Every structure is written in C-alpha cells, then in structure tokens.
Design a protein with these regions (language model features):
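P-loop NTP-binding core
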Residues: 1-242
C-alpha cells in the first residue's frame, strides 16, 4: 500500500483538485484506490461521488477514528471513498495524535494499493495524523509571499513528524504558475534552494476544474489541450509511483 497525503496550512491552493486527479490516475492504472476526505467542506467527496448531498451525511471518514465498521462509497469511476462532512470537527475534539497511530494501523490493514488523503488546513489530528501515516506528503502552493509563509509552517510540522516517522518523503508542488512572471520565478528559485520541488509545474487551466465538473480527469477531458493533459498525466503518475 502507498499512502499519499495532500496537505497545506493554507486553503485555496489546489489541494482537492490534486487529490481527485491522483485518485483517478490510480484507478486508471488498475490500483485498488481509496480516497479519505478529512476536510469538513467535503469538496473532494462531492466531486468524486458526483453527489453534493454526500458531504452532508455523517459516517464516512469519521469511522476511521472510531470502532465503527467502514462503509466506503464506491463511485462510478471505481474508486472507494470515505467522504468528508461537517461533523468531522468532532474528531479533533476527541482524538489525540497518539490515538491516530491506531488509525494508521487500521488503514494499513485495508485491501487497497493506493490511499489518497485530503486534509483540512487547520492544525489538528485530521491535519497531522495523515502525515504520520503517509509514505509521501505533497504540499501544493502558489508561488507568492502568502503561500511561502504557510509553507514554512507546513515544513516545520513535517520535520517534527519525521522525528517519529523517519522515512517520510515530502514534495512541494508549484500550482498556478505563470511562466512570464519574474516574481514567481524568483520565489521558485528561492524555494528550490531549500525544498524538493515536484515537476512539472502546473499552470492555471480552466479545463482542469471543468473536467472534474464532468467527473473525469483532465487528460480524459475533450476540451483540454494536449500540453495540459500530458503535464497532469506525468505529474500524477510520478506521485502515485507508477
């Protein structure tokens, strides 16, 4: 099993879009794929299940932290989903990080080849625990000063987690990149001196969100240009390990 956790302490950086594409890439490669949506907004769940009502239902990902049986939703694409919902805040109130190691063992025992986890930006067990469980933590960000500040906090958290999870791998993914922006290129050069950057970088493309609105990854979206399709296929294949 490979667990990929997508996280950032700043919202609105393309985290959920990446989660959906990683999961759909896994299914296309024949991997038994589970998405764990730990964000109370449940956006990944809504996109993948093609059902806005799913994010208002209890159960789902919350069952991981309890002794309740797991009941993943099987989506039309074939992936399994433990959905996010507004009641997940209660998990942070009653479960500590030490308890989350038990959750890791439970997760590792499940019959999946790939698990992709979407985390909330706020610090708590739903944010920290999945980084302890992961083989790879991916942090998407826009190359601007606000994102760099949040990245510093995220990387500090990852270094703390490495004290109990020495083999943890992390990568930073540049999203919404504008090639002609000198400021962005300077930020990226600075970042590259300190953290491992994942390539290719992602530029802003309307086709990416439009594809998910239709329930398909961008490389299967008829209105996406060839470059966008190839970039996303290469990126997701590299991150899921195949």
């Amino acid at each position: 099993m490979r667990i990929v956790t997508v996280t950032n302490q700043k919202g609105g950086v393309g985290k959920t879009t990446l989660v959906c594409h990683l999961a759909l890439a896994g299914v296309e490669r024949g991997l038994r794929t589970l998405v764990v949506d730990l964000d109370t907004q449940g956006n990944a769940s809504t996109m993948l299940a093609r059902d806005a009502a799913v994010a208002g239902q209890p159960g789902g990902a919350a069952a991981l932290f309890a002794d309740a049986p797991l009941a993943p939703t099987v989506t039309a694409s074939g992936l399994h989903l433990l959905h996010g919902h507004q009641h997940l805040d209660e998990v942070d109130q009653r479960v500590g990080l030490a308890d989350s190691r038990r959750v890791r063992d439970r997760l590792r025992a499940l019959p999946y080849d790939l698990v992709v986890i979407d985390t909330p930006p706020a610090i708590g067990v739903r944010h920290l625990g999945p980084q302890v469980w992961a083989d790879l933590v991916v942090t998407p960000l826009e190359p601007n000063s606000f994102s760099l500040l949040a990245l510093g906090q995220t990387l500090a958290t990852i270094e703390e987690i490495r004290s109990i999870r020495p083999g943890l791998e992390n990568r930073v993914l540049i999203n919404r990149f504008t090639r002609s922006s000198g400021q962005q290129n300077r930020y990226i050069a600075l970042l590259g001196e300190h953290v491992p950057l994942t390539r290719p970088f992602l530029t802003l493309r309307v086709a990416v969100s439009d594809a998910l609105d239709e329930g398909v990854p961008v490389w299967r979206f008829r209105r996406a240009d060839r470059e966008t399709r190839e970039i996303w296929m290469e990126l997701c294949g590299g991150l899921i390990g195949g």
